[in-house]
């Protein structure tokens, strides 16, 4: 059944029908469409459009339909109808006859699709919160178990200063917590119902939109009908939240790919999330991480795509908006899968603490400590920086780490350097001194872990 056509003389071109149809994508909204239709039936009852028996008959039929699509959601795809709304209404009429034709009274597909999509987003956000929590738990578990694992921290992909693997985990935990906060904020802004706005200007029927909104689980009804049917800010915002988080997951993946490489050997990925080569028997490839890194591009692509779709649209609804769903479904599903895969990667991650420690003692990553030592001796930091650079150059020529240099070489560049310099250059001492808020000092890291475990009740 087609929901329009009375003013048309000629049938639609067959290719146009397929081109115009969205059912291959929006069939995923069938449960939301049925749910919102049941709430709409109640609203029509209260407004006098339906009597009690009619409302019950419609809702019972919709409930039967809901049970069917929950078992076989792809049943919608067996039709050649224009969209999911057409399918639900057609099935309803088959079940209750002409009574089903009353349901669309006062309602437009414009407010209907906006409502359905928001309902789907709310449901998907619950799944995303669960995935985020899973990932946070795995990060905290590894962080808790690796507080004593010293490794190099990097800037410009060069060894910079010693940190701990635990500290590295907490860095990504901070990122994912910000992602979680952004998702919470996005949920707040989409948690209003456009149902009852009609095509663009509201409805002439006495619909209590606030009560209708709450019956569907929304916090409130939207304020302006013209804006409500054309608003896709929540789609853009969710795409943005997903993109930022996927950027974080991509960096997480890149770090672990590097740590897992033959050049680093800081970690070893589990056999369960790696693959081999069809030619080279020795290979164990970090495919899980490489795919996370690659899939971020798909999510970024949708963010740009939806912005371009919306940027030139006049108020209010335009068919262009049909292009909002396929990319959104894919972006949020991709984000969810990548969060889950990231958790799987961490579950059985083996950390080679010996290799981590060896690497942290190379490349003069304790040079900053030497400069700070000189500052403690009364030398300005800029002069201390220059003196330390000269000493590092000497150590490079001798191929000796700073902590192994003879005291006479230190004194060659500054008479202020005494035997106590060796305590300053010790990697454990170095970590303990970084005890400012957010620092790598073991007591600071331990306190952060305890706090996070308490919040997540683990």
UniProtKB/Swiss-Prot annotation:
GO molecular function list: argininosuccinate lyase activity
Predominant localisation class: cytoplasm
Keyword Cytoplasm: yes
Pathway per the UniProt entry: Amino-acid biosynthesis; L-arginine biosynthesis; L-arginine from L-ornithine and carbamoyl phosphate: step 3/3
E.C. no: 4.3.2.1
UniProt keyword list: Amino-acid biosynthesis, Arginine biosynthesis, Cytoplasm, Lyase
Membrane-spanning intervals of the chain: none
Highest taxon listed in the record's lineage: Bacteria
GO cellular component, as recorded: cytosol
Keyword Lipid biosynthesis listed: no
InterPro entries: Arg_succ_lyase_C, Argininosuccinate_lyase, Fumarase/histidase_N, Fumarate_lyase_CS, Fumarate_lyase_fam, Fumarate_lyase_N, L-Aspartase-like
Class of enzymatic activity (EC top level): lyase
Compartment(s): Cytoplasm
BP GO terms, sorted: arginine biosynthetic process via ornithine; L-arginine biosynthetic process
Reactions catalysed according to its record: 2-(N(omega)-L-arginino)succinate = fumarate + L-arginine
PANTHER family noted in UniProt: ARGININOSUCCINATE LYASE
Family: Belongs to the lyase 1 family. Argininosuccinate lyase subfamily.
Protein name: Argininosuccinate lyase
Provenance organism: Buchnera aphidicola subsp. Baizongia pistaciae (strain Bp)
Lineage: Bacteria, Pseudomonadati, Pseudomonadota, Gammaproteobacteria, Enterobacterales
């Amino acid at each position: 059944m087609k929901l329009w056509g009375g003013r048309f003389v000629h049938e639609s071109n067959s290719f146009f029908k397929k081109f115009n149809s969205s059912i291959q994508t929006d069939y995923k909204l069938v449960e939301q469409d049925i749910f919102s239709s049941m709430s709409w039936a109640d609203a029509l009852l209260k407004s006098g459009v339906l009597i009690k028996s009619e409302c019950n008959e419609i809702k019972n039929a919709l409930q039967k339909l809901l049970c069917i699509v929950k078992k076989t959601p792809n049943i919608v795809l067996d039709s050649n109808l224009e969209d999911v709304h057409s399918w639900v209404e057609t099935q309803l009429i088959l079940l209750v006859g002409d009574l089903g034709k009353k349901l669309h009274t006062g309602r437009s597909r414009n407010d209907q699709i906006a409502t359905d999509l928001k309902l789907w987003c709310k449901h998907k956000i619950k799944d995303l919160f669960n995935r985020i929590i899973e990932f946070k738990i795995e990060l905290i578990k590894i962080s808790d178990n690796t507080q004593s694992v010293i490794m190099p921290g990097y800037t410009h992909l060069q060894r910079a200063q010693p940190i701990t693997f635990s500290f590295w985990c907490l860095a990504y935990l901070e990122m994912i917590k910000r992602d979680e906060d952004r998702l919470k904020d996005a949920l707040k802004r989409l948690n209003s119902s456009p149902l009852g706005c009609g095509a663009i200007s509201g409805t002439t029927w006495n619909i209590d939109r606030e009560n209708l909104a709450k019956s569907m689980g929304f916090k409130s009804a939207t304020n302006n009908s013209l804006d409500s049917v054309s608003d896709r800010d929540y789609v853009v915002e969710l795409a943005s939240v997903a993109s930022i988080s996927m950027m974080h997951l991509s960096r997480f993946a890149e770090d672990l790919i590097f740590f897992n490489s033959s050049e680093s050997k800081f970690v070893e990925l589990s056999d369960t999330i790696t693959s081999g080569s069809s030619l080279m028997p020795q290979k164990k490839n970090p495919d899980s991480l490489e795919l996370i890194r690659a899939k971020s591009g798909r999510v970024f692509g949708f963010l740009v795509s939806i912005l371009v779709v919306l940027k030139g649209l006049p108020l209010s609804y335009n068919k262009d908006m049909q292009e909002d769903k396929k990319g959104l479904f894919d972006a949020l599903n991709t984000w969810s899968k990548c969060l889950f895969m990231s958790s799987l990667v961490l579950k059985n991650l083996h950390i080679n603490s010996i290799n981590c420690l060896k690497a942290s003692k190379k490349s003069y990553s304790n040079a900053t400590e030497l400069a700070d030592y000189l500052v403690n001796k009364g030398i300005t930091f800029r002069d201390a920086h220059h003196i330390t650079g000269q000493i590092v150059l000497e150590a490079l020529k001798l191929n000796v780490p700073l902590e192994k240099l003879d005291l006479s070489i230190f004194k060659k560049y500054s008479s202020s350097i005494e035997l106590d310099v060796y305590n300053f250059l010790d990697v454990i001492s170095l970590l303990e001194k970084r005890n400012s808020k957010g620092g790598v000092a073991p007591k600071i890291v331990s306190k952060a872990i305890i706090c996070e475990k308490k919040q997540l009740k683990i």
